[in-house]
């Protein structure tokens, strides 16, 4: 379980975003731990600068739904996406169909992490999936954060979405093999070794 005391996060305001150095082609990774209006300002600035925004909907609240249509890439876990799909009135017989409805409605990419079942992306250009590593989990806290961090870093290093997702899925899996959030984030060398 993760408990969040807003503290410093709650003091990050939209006007603080103006101080960020964001350039064309950069990747801007955001999550919902700062005020929604601040996340919205960062997504807007990324778009204006020609950067790619990645929104992690965690910790999920319904304010994230409006931002999902603005971010270039949204990452949600199964529960978060299902809640968002209901709020957006996305129709479909299963999650993948609802993900396709999201892309049709927004023109944006949606990635849903599926725990031990890996990850699925639906994009305007096609669908991709990546498997999770077969592990014995110790603690799943931080797996989503690790996934998102590795996804953003891998894309920024020039990997395509499918390869970036595979690396991120492996990293997220490895993060579950140790206790704690930050201490469990694996080194890139360990991720690449596990993928070999």
Predicted features and spans:
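Ribokinase/PfkB-type carbohydrate-kinase core domain
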Residues: 1-128
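Conserved phosphate-binding/catalytic region of the ribokinase-like
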Residues: 62-65, 87, 92-196
